[in-house]
Swiss-Prot record:
GO terms for cellular component: cytosol. The lineage of its organism: Bacteria, Bacillati, Bacillota, Bacilli, Lactobacillales. It is an enzyme of class 6 (ligase). This is Phosphoribosylformylglycinamidine cyclo-ligase. GO terms for biological process: 'de novo' IMP biosynthetic process; adenine biosynthetic process. The keyword DNA repair does not apply.
Amino acid sequence: MNRYKDAGVDVEAGYDLVKRIKKDIAATSRPETSGTIGSFGGMFDLEKLGYQHPVLVSGTDGVGTKLMIAQEMGINDTIGIDCVAMCVNDVLAQGAEPLFFLDYIATGHNDPAKLAQVVHGVAEGCRQSGSALIGGETAEMPDMYPKNEYDLAGFSTGIANKEDILTQDLAKEGDILIGLPSSGVHSNGFSLIRQVLFKDHHLKVTDRPEALEGKSIGEILLTPTKIYVQAVLSLVKRHLLHGIAHITGGGLIENLPRTYNDDLQAEVNLGAWPVQAIFRYLQNKGQLKEQDCLNTFNMGIGLVLLVPKANVLQVKEQLKQKNEQYYEIGKLRKRPIGEKKIVFNGSFK
């Protein structure tokens, strides 16, 4: 008799999970990593990177109630990409190169096959961002979570030379705002999405509204959050940018002003980029005002680069070389007394 297992915690299932994820973890290895899976801590040799005045930059995040969509659909192998993306894009926004990542999974019942799929997604996100997955924790808590549910969070650490950190002081009047498209909703606003679609309108994740061009609601919503590291890190290292805004919870309204001082104002042209069908669909179904959408969703722009005028052509050319789409969406100007830090012109396409 195993009293611990009877109480709801299966240690053997934990060992099974570790075996299943070893190959995925190994695929994220970097030359700076050391130690083995199962050690008490993950290790990373900073000296090999050759930074002169290194500053570590850390970020942590989860996936929010997007997890509920994944679990309802039984699609667990992409939600880990979202978790990594939410963390590494934040680290990138400070001007840092993501180095390593740790994940935390909490569940009511350790299903090794299911959770291995989750970690597979985490590993894929790490590969896309150049991060080593150096550790993690799986907590089986039968009285805390329902049997078939899990929660996921992650922790990213990056590095930059102190003088290369992107701060608000770098942004200047006349800087051009270049927006990089999102892959969709990303990982924010899902409580509102679920309220509008599933509670107010009683829709199902398997429904295929005509407005979504034949794709199911669940399929669209589960599109992984885009990771921007490969496209943007080289621009940071070449000192071509004055700032980066990761457009997450709070949308453009809350996140873009975080990149510049109070004496500046962002002027954003709403017609400068196409808005994906899912945002129009949500706006119509929820009868949401444009301002509410801008304050909740990314509305098609996942990352905004603050670019000095003199660097705009070079930045655009390098983005083209990376096959990264971009839109010139506005500029920074002096903030008139009494006005907000961000204003919008026109309307969405």
